[in-house]
UniProtKB/Swiss-Prot annotation:
Source taxon at top rank: Bacteria
Identification of the protein by name: Uncharacterized PPE family protein PPE46
Any one GO biological process: response to host immune response
Other remarks in the entry: Was identified as a high-confidence drug target.
InterPro entries named in the record: PPE-PPW_C, PPE_dom, PPE_sf
Organism encoding this protein: Mycobacterium tuberculosis (strain ATCC 25618 / H37Rv)
PANTHER family per the UniProt record, alphabetical: GLUTAMINE-RICH PROTEIN 2 (PTHR46766:SF1)
Family in the record: Belongs to the mycobacterial PPE family.
SUPFAM superfamilies, per database record: PE/PPE dimer-like (SSF140459)
Practical and industrial applications: Exhibits vaccine potential. Immunogenicity is demonstrated in BALB/c mice. Immunization with this protein induces a significant number of CD8+ T cells and a strong Th1-type response, with high gamma interferon (IFN-gamma) and low interleukin-4 responses, and activation of the bactericidal activity of macrophages. Identified T-cell epitopes may contribute to immunity against tuberculosis if included in a vaccine.
Gene3D superfamilies per UniProt: PPE superfamily
């Protein structure tokens, strides 16, 4: 890189360039723009910091909140750094503008240089017998001073602008918030799966269709002027109530009208066939792409739904006390008695409002529960007002689901179909109603 030699040019060049330049207005406008950008960056960073802090404090919970915070914390830091860089850039633009103003103030002006040249010309013109030798020397020395001053001012201005240019920070690119390449694979597969629109197939089908019906279309177009004239004559005959003329015109042109009608019907059929064929091609293309793309889009969606639903179902099972259901035995034994014995109640009758037997004795210790809780109900076991029979199958099995109140059910659960009118009098192993 070569640096300009300011001393090699006369001061008129430097003074003219500085005076005729755009001035410091553009630099000051750029500095104001950088200052506004710095303030905007700072405001956005502050607002986003509040949001990220709220999310991190627990407004959201789960992996999504963690990913949000992890993605936006670097972006907030970049906003803060960008605000500082913009403020620094504004300051450097102000420094460059100030350097320009100082250089313009220190630079010898064009009127001063012109006055020096005019004085030198007058002194030289009136230098009779060398009387102006000393003034001419002083004038030339003053011009040399302005020459050196102009070169010095330009060197200082170059140093100030170069330092401002070097000190101006360059803001790096913003960090990526959305994970790059997250959907590239699925998009590539979907793009490879989607077939292009069948323009060529449609054009080929239409060409074949028009070729098949071309003779009818040509005949229809050739007959159209004559048929139009015939219809005009018939219309005039109708308006003039010329029945005889109408019949004569219609009879003399019957063959033409018949051929025109036949050709028109063929063309209409061909047009409908072409429209139906194009619709069929487009529908087949749409359905084929749907069957190819929907599984690609539905797979990740169903996987996400399953991942979200399965933990929820497991949590509900834990709340309901079904986290550890006992396994059903491989083979069920003989049905065990639902109630071992029922002691008679005083008076022999229980109030109709009683819902359960008043006193129940547990089954003998030697009887084991061989049937565990099933997913099927007891079913219809009888009606109110009927007596139980030994030949009828009795309810078998106890509900032994464990919960925080105990390890098993101390009292057997009666079927829900038994109404509140049951009494507590035992009769041959059955329940008797009143």
């Amino acid at each position: 890189m070569t640096a300009p030699v300011w001393l090699a040019s006369p001061p008129e060049v430097h003074s003219a360039l500085l005076s005729a330049g755009p001035g410091p207005g553009s630099l000051q406008a750029a500095a104001a723009g950088w200052s506004a950008l710095s303030a905007e960056y700072a405001a956005v960073a502050q607002e986003l910091s509040v949001v990220v802090a709220a999310v991190g404090a627990g407004v959201w919970q789960g992996p999504s909140a963690e990913l949000f915070v992890a993605a936006y914390v670097p972006y907030v830091a970049w906003l803060v750094q960008a605000s500082a860089d913009s403020a620094a850039a504004a300051g450097e633009h102000e420094a460059a503008a100030a350097g320009y103003v100082c250089a313009l103030a220190e630079m010898p002006t064009l009127p001063e240089l012109a006055a020096n040249h005019l004085t030198h010309a007058v002194l030289v013109a009136t230098n009779f017998f060398g009387i102006n030798t000393i003034p001419i020397a002083l004038n030339e020395a003053d011009y040399v001073r302005m020459w050196v001053q102009a070169a010095t001012v330009m060197s200082a201005y170059e140093a100030v602008v170069g330092a401002a240019l070097v000190a101006t920070p360059h803001t790096g690119p913003a960090p990526v918030i959305v994970k790059p390449g997250a959907n590239e694979a699925s998009n590539a597969v979907a793009a490879a799966t989607i077939t292009p629109f069948p323009w060529h197939e449609i054009v080929q089908f239409l060409e074949e269709t028009f070729a098949a019906y071309d003779q009818y279309l040509s005949a229809l177009l050739s007959e159209l002027p004559a048929v139009a004239w015939v219809w005009f004559q018939l219309f005039v005959d109708i308006l003039g109530f010329n029945i005889i003329g109408f019949i004569i015109t219609l009879a003399s042109n019957a063959q033409l009208l018949t051929e025109f009608a036949i050709n028109a019907s063929y063309v209409a059929v061909g047009l409908l066939y072409a429209i139906a064929g194009v619709i069929d091609i487009v529908v087949e293309w749409v359905i084929g792409n749907l069957f190819g793309v929907v599984p690609l889009l539905g797979g990740p969606l169903l996987g996400a739904l399953a991942a979200a639903v399965v933990p929820g179902v497991a949590g509900l099972a834990g709340v309901a006390g079904l986290a550890a259901l006992p396994a059903v035995g491989a083979a069920a034994g003989a049905p065990a008695a639902l109630v071992g014995s029922v002691a008679p109640v005083s008076g022999g009758v229980v109030s109709p409002q009683a819902r359960l037997v008043s006193a129940v004795e547990p089954a003998p210790a030697s009887t084991s529960v061989s049937v565990l809780a099933s997913d099927r109900g007891a079913g219809a076991l009888g009606f109110v007002g009927t007596a139980g029979k030994e030949s009828v199958g009795q309810p078998a099995g106890l509900t032994v689901l464990a919960d925080e109140f105990g390890d098993g059910a101390p009292v057997p659960m009666l079927p829900g179909s038994w109404g509140p009118d049951l009494v507590g009098v035992a009769g041959d192993g059955g329940l008797v109603s009143v």
